[in-house]
Amino acid sequence: MEEREGTNINNIPTSFGLKQHETPLPPPGYPPRSENPNLFPVGQSSTSSAAAAVKPSENVAPPFSLTMPVENSSSELKKKRGRPRKYNPDGSLAVTLSPMPISSSVPLTSEFGSRKRGRGRGRGRGRGRGRGQGQGSREPNNNNNDNNWLKNPQMFEFNNNTPTSGGGGPAEIVSPSFTPHVLTVNAGEDVTMKIMTFSQQGSRAICILSANGPISNVTLRQSMTSGGTLTYEGHFEILSLTGSFIPSESGGTRSRAGGMSVSLAGQDGRVFGGGLAGLFIAAGPVQVMVGSFIAGQEESQQQQQQIKKQRRERLGIPTTTQASNISFGGSAEDPKARYGLNKPVVIQPPPVSAPPVSFSHEPSTNTVHGYYANNTANHIKDLFSSLPGEDREEDEDDLEGEDDEEFGGHSESDTEVPS
């Protein structure tokens, strides 16, 4: 171990690029050796070399010595390569940084971070080989990020902004098809009339979900008694109240169809109930939970109307539209006018002149056939003529002349015969 330390000390580079050769320290009890050994030793015996070290000869060049600080082997410690850690193993920030300089020529200063500059790139800079200055290891950051959610006070807060219904109105957030309501009936008022009045305010159907409160007078439907009803007077508590009223239309008149049933408890604990058939007087404040909704058939009709209305608004069609006939340049009765055939092409048949009543010879079938063939050919030529003005008149004159010559008649007699 001492030999390794000695070799390390001997090979310390100087600021002049030379290596300082120093002999190992002598053991205790021996005289110290000279610090200026002979730079040019000669291969002699140990005694001659020692004498030459004490008294150099005249032929040898004068000695060359360097005076520079030499570090003790005891202060020599094993240095760790790389940049020092910014964080301790426990995750705390290492504030005191005291790195050792690389060489003895570098001045020893306490501000190590100011002279050392990271080779990495910062934000907005070019490429670099490593992380920028001031960036530490990622492990403590990951631990801090993992524990940040514990420090967030909103993480353990519950949402207390739940919608609550008011004292006598609908809830704040409700569905359009079902809306809850709370009705309050004061003492001495009829609960049944209160519910019926509420149901007639709109076109929606209602259902009674529950009720609570004291009752002083109630009339129930009893089929076993005379008259079919039975009235109870006293102090009773409402256990349950259910029922529904759905709008109906018959013969052009709209009405409400439905009913309610109640269960009551007397002061002695006996329970009775039945369908309400009359008075239902409250002895104190009574709260009734009612829900309004749209009936199935009415809901489907309203949805269809709403869908149609939305489609009309998208297309830009007014709400009250009448059926309009789309015409293509003509009336709806004329099918040709729909396709723009306002001026139909009419092919006029050739003038057919009947033979006179009295003539000297009988026409043969060959002459009649040749007559129609000639007239048809001339008529087709007339249709495809380039000048329909003068040429058509000349062709008609020629046809009339040929007809007169063939049948031997006059033009006046030919025009008098209907075609």
Curated annotation (Swiss-Prot):
One of its GO terms (molecular function) is minor groove of adenine-thymine-rich DNA binding. Gene3D superfamilies: Hypothetical protein, similar to alpha- acetolactate decarboxylase, domain 2. Residues 174-314 form the PPC domain. GO terms for biological process: xylem and phloem pattern formation; xylem development. Residues 136-148 have a biased composition (Low complexity). Residues 115-130 have a biased composition (Basic residues). The gene is AHL4. Disruption phenotype: Misspecification of tissue boundaries between the xylem and procambium. Residues 101-112, 318-328 have a biased composition (Polar residues). The keyword DNA-binding applies. The PPC domain mediates interactions between AHL proteins. Keywords: DNA-binding, Nucleus, Transcription, Transcription regulation. InterPro entries: AHL, PPC_dom. GO terms for cellular component: nucleus. Homodimer. Interacts with AHL3. Predominantly expressed in the stele of the root meristem with a specificity to the procambium. Pfam families: PCC. This is AT-hook motif nuclear-localized protein 4. Residues 1-168, 301-337, 382-419 are annotated as: Disordered. It comes from the Eukaryota. Residues 78-90 bind DNA. Transcription factor that specifically binds AT-rich DNA sequences related to the nuclear matrix attachment regions (MARs). Acts redundantly with AHL3 to regulate the formation of tissue boundary between the xylem and procambium in the root meristem. Cell-to-cell movement of AHL4 from the procambium to the xylem is critical for its function in root vascular patterning. It is found in: Nucleus. Residues 391-406 have a biased composition (Acidic residues). A motif (Bipartite nuclear localization signal) lies at residues 78-86. The keyword Mitochondrion does not apply. Transmembrane segments: none annotated.
